[in-house]
Design a protein with these regions (language model features):
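Hydrophobic, aromatic-enriched alpha-helical segments typical of multi-pass transmembrane helices
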Residues: 1-213
Length: 213
């Protein structure tokens, strides 16, 4: 990989992460029971926001593919981490698809309260499951890449440490059956954003020859 390609991948990761953080403002930002309280982007289409979030996940996958090549894709840990990250991002995209499109289509397709309630509960459970699965898989992938990132640079060591922390938090929350509500979604997004930005910095500041420090 050339230095420009490496920096471009880092820039893609940083941009996708930043946009995803902005899109999270579509959700309530307080614990008030008022539905619209704190929804800075409440006037944005739910479908548009979730479609854009899926686009961010796709952009992250593209940028992280460059990280895989930078970390030496012949290594088993690199390949395993890439597979876990890809599967995790796919699960998160599925969760966004359910929340952004499937739920709305269900409500529009019937006026039967019983069908709406049963379908809503089913889709909510599916969304929660995909979110939890995606979070754990991404955390596993980030931690699996930690040894390779640690060898890169100071930014790489920060990313490596964050990867281990994210995995610990994800496993703790999963084993305690805390559910995947808004607070957990925001916390998971913030933790993954820090890791992504550290990885982006590792790529942008990488040596032209691609060798570790």
């Amino acid at each position: 990989m050339t230095a420009n390609q490496t920096r471009a991948d880092g820039a893609i990761i940083a941009a996708a992460t930043g946009l995803a953080l902005v899109l999270m403002l579509h959700h309530p930002t307080s614990l008030s029971t008022t539905h619209d309280d704190g929804q800075f982007l409440s006037d944005w289409s739910n479908g548009f926001v979730h479609a854009a979030m899926i686009g961010c996940l796709l952009a992250l996958a593209i940028g992280l593919d460059g990280v895989k090549r930078q970390l030496d894709e012949t290594r088993i840990l690199t390949r395993t981490g890439a597979l876990l990250l890809g599967a995790g991002l796919l699960a998160l995209a599925g969760a966004a698809l359910v929340n952004g499109f499937a739920t709305g289509r269900l409500l529009a397709s019937t006026s039967d309260p019983a069908v709406r309630e049963a379908g809503g509960h089913t889709l909510w459970a599916l969304n929660q499951s995909l979110d939890a699965l995606g979070t754990v898989l991404v955390a596993l992938g980030a931690a699996t890449w930690s040894p390779g990132l640690w060898r890169r640079s100071f930014a790489g060591r920060v990313a490596a440490a964050l990867g281990v922390v994210i995995l610990g938090l994800a496993l703790w929350h999963t084993t305690t059956d805390g559910g995947f509500g808004l607070q957990m979604a925001v916390a998971a997004m913030a933790a993954f954003a820090l890791w992504s930005l550290a990885v982006a910095a590792t790529m942008i500041l990488a040596r032209p020859d691609g060798e570790a420090e």
